[in-house]
Structures are given as C-alpha cells and as structure tokens.
Amino acid sequence: MQTLEIALLSTLLLFPLVDLVLEKYKFRSKCAEYIKTSAMLWVVTGFLFFCYLIDVLKIDPPQYLPSASWKVYLAIFIFAVFIAYMKYVLSSINKDANVRLQVLNAFEDGGKSFLEILPSSRREFLLFTLLVSVSAGVCEELIFRWYLYSSIEQHTGEFVAVIGSSIIFGIWHTYLGWKHVIKTAVVGVLLCGIYLYFESIVVAIVAHIFMDVYSGSVAFIARKAQGAELTNA
C-alpha cells in the first residue's frame, strides 16, 4: 500500500473526529453549514479521484450503468414508484395534522443535531436538495460503495466488505448520535446491496440522493404546514 493510499484511508477514518470538532464551531447560518459540509465531501472525493487517476489505488473503475437492460428499466420503475410514494406522503403531511404531528415528533426523537441539519426555510430546502443531497449521494457512494467496498473486498470477501464499509459509513455520521450511526450503517448495507445487485454506481447514487431529498422534503413540508397552522390559529 502506497503512502498516498494510507493518507486517503487515514482521512476517511479520521473524518468523523474532524466532524465532531467542527460541530462545536458551527456557522450560525444553516445555509453556510450546508456549503461547508458539501465542500468537505467534495475535497475528500477529489483526493480519492486524484489517487485513482495517478494509479495509487489498485481497484477497478466503478460500473456506471447496469449491464442488463432490464435492470435499467427496473431501477427506473422503482424510482418512479418512490417518487409517487413521496408525493403521497408529502400530501398527507400537508393535509393531515395528526400525520404532521407524528412526523414532527419523530424528528424530535432524532435529537438536536439531526433537527439542525434539516431545512426550515425555502432557501434552506433548495440548498439541501440541490447541494447537500446531491453532494452526499455522489461523494459518499463513490467513497463507500466504490472505493472502500472494493478495497476491503480484495482482502476479505464480499460479506465482510459490505459490513465493513457500511460500519464506517455509519461512523461518519457520529455527530448525529449513536442511534443514527446504527441506522446509517443499516442504510449503508441497503445501498451496498443496490450497488451490487444493479452493478451500477449511478443507481446507488440516485437512490442515495432520493433518500436524502425525501428526509429534507418531509421535514420542510411538516414545518411549513405546522407554521401556517399556528399562524391561522
């Protein structure tokens, strides 16, 4: 293993500690935090690609699209169903006060750090959707499902690679609390399964983006509708 790859792995393993330290020095503006978080992800991903382009990393390039055309159509169908489901959920939150209250209580149970990263205003929602969700989807899938999974799989095997890369993925979210570390690790296993089944990093990236957009949309709509309800009361 070359020095640059050791530096890359060290960066990935120490990233959660850096994140915890930076939690104490947050910007007052949530939008500024979104930009900072996204920039950090792209810096790490840029370092990863630099190492790959100069042949430091002995891994194959990611497969972009499924080799079987029916898997492409299956992915499109699943995403279409997910979009329809998301529209239904958002409509229910907007119309039903009981559903809205359940959603808001669930977010409250997620902890302060989790609440703070979710958008409240329209500007925050747009930035969360177009910048944070896309950055997390692209960067984290390349880091965990492509690089880390491939690196671990070379030395251990598929099962250990799925679990190992997903655990590290979960640890990257330590700043949200240990409950979210476990949940995120489980999501990591799911995303790894998607990557392996569809044989496509693009499908995994889109799935990741949709998950984040869903969380941000639910939070924004619930808060917006609740605010309107209180104003009209």
Segments (PLM) and residue ranges:
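Alpha-helical transmembrane spans of integral membrane proteins, capturing the lipid-embedded, hydrophobic core
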Residues: 8-16, 41-46, 73-84, 129, ...
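Structural signal for membrane-spanning alpha-helices in multi-pass inner-membrane proteins
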Residues: 19, 47-55, 83-87, 169, ...
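N-terminal, membrane-interfacial amphipathic/helix-forming hydrophobic leader that caps
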Residues: 1-74, 160, 216-233
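Short helix-terminus and kink motifs of transmembrane alpha helices
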Residues: 19-23, 88-92, 146, 150
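Cytoplasmic-side transmembrane-helix entry/capping segments in multi-pass membrane proteins
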Residues: 32-39, 98-100, 181-187
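Transmembrane helix-loop-helix hairpins at the membrane interface
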Residues: 113-233
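Small-residue-rich segments of transmembrane alpha-helices in multi-pass membrane proteins
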Residues: 38-48, 105-112, 187-199
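Juxtamembrane helix-loop-helix connectors linking adjacent transmembrane helices
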Residues: 55-135, 154, 225-232
